[in-house]
Amino acid sequence: MPPVRCVIFDCDSTLTRIEGIDFLAGPVREESQRLTEQAMRGLVRLEDIYGRRLALIAPTRDQVAAVGERYLAELVPDAGAVVAALQGEGIQVRILSGGLLPAVLTLARALGVPDWLVGAVNIFFNADGSYAGFDSASPLARSGGKLEMVERWRPALPRPVMMVGDGATDLETRPGVDRMVAFAGVVVRPAVVAGADTVITSTSLAPVLPLALDHELPRAPGARALYEQGAARLAAQSTERPS
Protein backbone atom coordinates (compact mmCIF):
# COMPACT_ATOMS: atom_id res chain seq x y z
CA MET A 1 0.00 0.00 0.00
CA PRO A 2 1.34 3.51 -0.74
CA PRO A 3 1.87 5.98 2.12
CA VAL A 4 -1.43 6.93 3.71
CA ARG A 5 -2.87 10.42 3.50
CA CYS A 6 -5.00 10.23 6.65
CA VAL A 7 -4.56 8.54 10.03
CA ILE A 8 -7.57 8.20 12.33
CA PHE A 9 -6.72 7.54 15.97
CA ASP A 10 -8.92 6.20 18.71
CA CYS A 11 -8.45 8.15 21.94
CA ASP A 12 -8.80 6.00 25.08
CA SER A 13 -6.14 3.28 25.44
CA THR A 14 -4.57 4.48 22.18
CA LEU A 15 -3.50 8.13 22.39
CA THR A 16 -3.86 8.07 26.17
CA ARG A 17 -3.42 5.22 28.63
CA ILE A 18 -6.75 5.60 30.40
CA GLU A 19 -10.40 4.92 29.61
CA GLY A 20 -11.98 8.28 30.39
CA ILE A 21 -15.42 7.12 31.49
CA ASP A 22 -13.86 4.51 33.78
CA PHE A 23 -11.61 7.21 35.27
CA LEU A 24 -14.76 9.17 36.15
CA ALA A 25 -16.41 6.23 37.83
CA GLY A 26 -14.99 6.56 41.36
CA PRO A 27 -16.85 4.18 43.71
CA VAL A 28 -18.53 2.42 40.76
CA ARG A 29 -15.29 2.07 38.78
CA GLU A 30 -15.20 -1.72 38.98
CA GLU A 31 -18.65 -2.03 37.41
CA SER A 32 -17.86 0.63 34.80
CA GLN A 33 -14.61 -1.11 33.86
CA ARG A 34 -16.42 -4.43 33.54
CA LEU A 35 -18.96 -2.93 31.16
CA THR A 36 -16.28 -1.13 29.15
CA GLU A 37 -14.18 -4.25 28.74
CA GLN A 38 -17.18 -6.27 27.58
CA ALA A 39 -17.92 -3.68 24.90
CA MET A 40 -14.30 -3.29 23.79
CA ARG A 41 -13.99 -7.06 23.40
CA GLY A 42 -17.18 -7.11 21.36
CA LEU A 43 -19.05 -9.23 23.92
CA VAL A 44 -21.93 -6.77 24.28
CA ARG A 45 -23.26 -3.98 22.10
CA LEU A 46 -21.94 -0.56 23.03
CA GLU A 47 -25.45 0.91 23.03
CA ASP A 48 -26.44 -1.58 25.73
CA ILE A 49 -23.91 -0.21 28.19
CA TYR A 50 -23.08 3.38 27.19
CA GLY A 51 -26.00 5.07 28.91
CA ARG A 52 -25.82 2.68 31.87
CA ARG A 53 -22.25 3.71 32.61
CA LEU A 54 -23.05 7.41 32.51
CA ALA A 55 -26.18 6.96 34.62
CA LEU A 56 -24.07 5.13 37.21
CA ILE A 57 -21.49 7.89 37.27
CA ALA A 58 -23.58 11.06 36.61
CA PRO A 59 -20.41 13.10 35.92
CA THR A 60 -20.37 16.84 36.51
CA ARG A 61 -18.95 19.41 34.11
CA ASP A 62 -15.87 19.83 36.31
CA GLN A 63 -15.30 16.09 36.48
CA VAL A 64 -15.41 15.77 32.70
CA ALA A 65 -12.96 18.66 32.40
CA ALA A 66 -10.67 16.77 34.78
CA VAL A 67 -10.77 13.78 32.45
CA GLY A 68 -9.34 15.94 29.68
CA GLU A 69 -6.45 16.96 31.91
CA ARG A 70 -5.91 13.36 32.93
CA TYR A 71 -5.81 12.36 29.27
CA LEU A 72 -2.87 14.73 28.84
CA ALA A 73 -1.11 13.44 31.95
CA GLU A 74 -1.46 9.87 30.67
CA LEU A 75 -0.46 10.36 27.02
CA VAL A 76 0.93 7.23 25.41
CA PRO A 77 4.68 7.67 24.78
CA ASP A 78 5.44 9.56 21.56
CA ALA A 79 1.78 10.33 20.86
CA GLY A 80 2.38 14.05 20.46
CA ALA A 81 5.54 13.59 18.41
CA VAL A 82 3.85 11.11 16.08
CA VAL A 83 0.87 13.39 15.46
CA ALA A 84 3.20 16.32 14.74
CA ALA A 85 5.39 14.22 12.43
CA LEU A 86 2.39 12.92 10.49
CA GLN A 87 1.05 16.43 10.04
CA GLY A 88 4.53 17.58 8.99
CA GLU A 89 4.44 14.99 6.22
CA GLY A 90 1.12 16.35 4.98
CA ILE A 91 -0.90 13.48 6.47
CA GLN A 92 -4.25 14.47 7.94
CA VAL A 93 -4.79 13.34 11.55
CA ARG A 94 -8.28 12.73 12.92
CA ILE A 95 -9.53 11.42 16.27
CA LEU A 96 -12.59 9.18 16.46
CA SER A 97 -13.70 8.23 19.95
CA GLY A 98 -16.60 6.92 21.97
CA GLY A 99 -15.32 9.16 24.75
CA LEU A 100 -16.90 12.39 25.95
CA LEU A 101 -16.45 15.29 23.54
CA PRO A 102 -15.25 18.01 25.97
CA ALA A 103 -12.49 15.74 27.31
CA VAL A 104 -11.47 14.45 23.87
CA LEU A 105 -11.29 18.02 22.54
CA THR A 106 -8.90 18.93 25.36
CA LEU A 107 -6.59 16.16 24.18
CA ALA A 108 -7.03 16.97 20.50
CA ARG A 109 -6.25 20.67 20.94
CA ALA A 110 -3.11 19.87 22.93
CA LEU A 111 -1.97 17.61 20.07
CA GLY A 112 -2.76 20.21 17.42
CA VAL A 113 -5.75 18.38 15.93
CA PRO A 114 -8.50 20.85 14.89
CA ASP A 115 -11.96 20.47 16.40
CA TRP A 116 -13.52 19.71 13.00
CA LEU A 117 -11.34 16.61 12.66
CA VAL A 118 -12.60 15.13 15.95
CA GLY A 119 -15.57 12.85 16.54
CA ALA A 120 -16.77 12.00 20.07
CA VAL A 121 -19.99 11.84 22.12
CA ASN A 122 -21.41 15.11 23.39
CA ILE A 123 -22.56 15.37 27.00
CA PHE A 124 -25.05 17.81 28.51
CA PHE A 125 -25.09 19.59 31.87
CA ASN A 126 -27.57 21.57 33.90
CA ALA A 127 -26.88 25.20 34.76
CA ASP A 128 -25.24 24.13 38.03
CA GLY A 129 -22.87 21.79 36.16
CA SER A 130 -24.64 18.57 37.14
CA TYR A 131 -25.15 15.77 34.62
CA ALA A 132 -28.15 16.18 32.31
CA GLY A 133 -27.61 13.43 29.74
CA PHE A 134 -25.64 12.60 26.62
CA ASP A 135 -26.22 12.61 22.89
CA SER A 136 -27.94 9.25 22.62
CA ALA A 137 -28.35 9.79 18.86
CA SER A 138 -24.59 9.86 18.33
CA PRO A 139 -23.34 6.93 16.23
CA LEU A 140 -20.34 6.77 18.56
CA ALA A 141 -22.54 5.64 21.45
CA ARG A 142 -23.45 2.41 19.64
CA SER A 143 -21.72 -0.56 18.05
CA GLY A 144 -20.86 0.00 14.40
CA GLY A 145 -20.92 3.75 14.95
CA LYS A 146 -17.28 4.37 14.13
CA LEU A 147 -17.74 2.80 10.72
CA GLU A 148 -20.82 4.98 10.25
CA MET A 149 -18.73 8.05 11.08
CA VAL A 150 -15.98 7.00 8.67
CA GLU A 151 -18.63 6.69 5.96
CA ARG A 152 -19.99 10.14 6.83
CA TRP A 153 -16.47 11.54 6.61
CA ARG A 154 -15.70 9.70 3.37
CA PRO A 155 -16.23 12.63 0.92
CA ALA A 156 -13.62 14.68 2.80
CA LEU A 157 -11.20 11.87 3.71
CA PRO A 158 -7.86 11.93 1.91
CA ARG A 159 -7.06 8.34 0.94
CA PRO A 160 -5.53 5.91 1.68
CA VAL A 161 -6.78 5.95 5.28
CA MET A 162 -5.31 4.10 8.26
CA MET A 163 -7.21 3.49 11.52
CA VAL A 164 -5.28 3.01 14.77
CA GLY A 165 -7.13 1.72 17.83
CA ASP A 166 -7.42 -0.93 20.50
CA GLY A 167 -11.07 -1.91 20.69
CA ALA A 168 -13.81 -3.80 18.89
CA THR A 169 -15.40 -0.52 17.85
CA ASP A 170 -12.16 0.40 16.07
CA LEU A 171 -11.99 -2.96 14.31
CA GLU A 172 -15.52 -2.34 13.03
CA THR A 173 -14.12 0.45 10.82
CA ARG A 174 -12.12 -2.09 8.79
CA PRO A 175 -14.50 -2.12 5.77
CA GLY A 176 -14.24 1.67 5.51
CA VAL A 177 -10.48 2.15 5.80
CA ASP A 178 -7.49 0.93 3.83
CA ARG A 179 -5.52 -0.40 6.79
CA MET A 180 -6.54 -1.30 10.33
CA VAL A 181 -3.78 -1.14 12.93
CA ALA A 182 -4.46 -2.68 16.35
CA PHE A 183 -2.60 -0.79 19.06
CA ALA A 184 -1.91 -3.29 21.84
CA GLY A 185 0.53 -1.16 23.80
CA VAL A 186 -1.96 -0.39 26.59
CA VAL A 187 -4.54 -3.20 26.46
CA VAL A 188 -4.39 -6.39 24.38
CA ARG A 189 -7.77 -7.46 23.04
CA PRO A 190 -7.30 -10.77 21.21
CA ALA A 191 -10.21 -10.42 18.79
CA VAL A 192 -8.98 -6.99 17.70
CA VAL A 193 -5.41 -8.23 17.28
CA ALA A 194 -6.66 -11.19 15.25
CA GLY A 195 -8.81 -9.03 12.98
CA ALA A 196 -6.34 -6.22 12.28
CA ASP A 197 -4.06 -5.94 9.27
CA THR A 198 -1.16 -4.90 11.48
CA VAL A 199 -0.51 -5.00 15.23
CA ILE A 200 1.66 -2.68 17.31
CA THR A 201 2.74 -4.33 20.55
CA SER A 202 5.08 -1.51 21.55
CA THR A 203 4.04 0.76 24.42
CA SER A 204 5.04 3.67 22.14
CA LEU A 205 3.09 4.99 19.16
CA ALA A 206 6.33 5.59 17.23
CA PRO A 207 5.66 2.60 14.89
CA VAL A 208 2.68 4.47 13.45
CA LEU A 209 5.03 6.79 11.55
CA PRO A 210 6.85 4.16 9.43
CA LEU A 211 3.56 2.31 8.91
CA ALA A 212 1.84 5.46 7.67
CA LEU A 213 4.76 6.27 5.36
CA ASP A 214 4.93 2.67 4.12
CA HIS A 215 8.53 2.58 5.33
CA GLU A 216 9.60 5.58 3.23
CA LEU A 217 11.84 8.04 5.06
CA PRO A 218 10.08 11.20 6.24
CA ARG A 219 10.87 14.39 4.35
CA ALA A 220 11.44 16.37 7.53
CA PRO A 221 14.91 15.61 8.97
CA GLY A 222 13.58 16.24 12.48
CA ALA A 223 11.18 13.31 12.16
CA ARG A 224 13.81 10.77 11.19
CA ALA A 225 14.86 9.82 14.72
CA LEU A 226 11.23 9.09 15.59
CA TYR A 227 10.83 7.16 12.34
CA GLU A 228 13.92 5.06 13.07
CA GLN A 229 12.70 4.38 16.61
CA GLY A 230 9.36 3.22 15.26
CA ALA A 231 10.95 1.08 12.57
CA ALA A 232 13.21 -0.58 15.14
CA ARG A 233 10.23 -1.36 17.36
CA LEU A 234 8.41 -2.89 14.39
CA ALA A 235 11.44 -4.97 13.49
CA ALA A 236 11.46 -6.39 17.01
CA GLN A 237 7.96 -7.79 16.69
CA SER A 238 5.82 -9.70 14.24
CA THR A 239 3.39 -7.10 12.92
CA GLU A 240 1.62 -8.67 9.99
CA ARG A 241 -1.36 -10.90 10.71
CA PRO A 242 -0.89 -14.32 9.06
CA SER A 243 -2.87 -14.65 5.84
Predicted regions and their residues:
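Conserved Lys-Pro-Asp/Glu-containing loop-to-beta segment of HAD-superfamily phosphomonoesterases
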Residues: 141-171
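Short, charged, surface-exposed secondary-structure boundary motifs
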Residues: 126-132, 190-199, 209-213
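Glycine/Thr-rich beta-alpha phosphate-binding loop at enzyme active sites
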Residues: 115-147
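Acidic, Mg2+-coordinating phosphoryl-transfer loop and its flanking beta/alpha structural elements
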Residues: 97-98, 160-201
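Membrane-embedded alpha-helical bundles of multi-pass transporters
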Residues: 222-228, 232-243
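A polyampholytic, Gly/Pro-enriched intrinsically disordered region
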Residues: 134-146, 204-207, 218-229
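Anion (oxyanion) recognition and catalysis
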Residues: 87, 112, 155, 175, ...
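Alpha-helical substrate-recognition element adjacent to the catalytic core
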Residues: 1-122, 127, 203
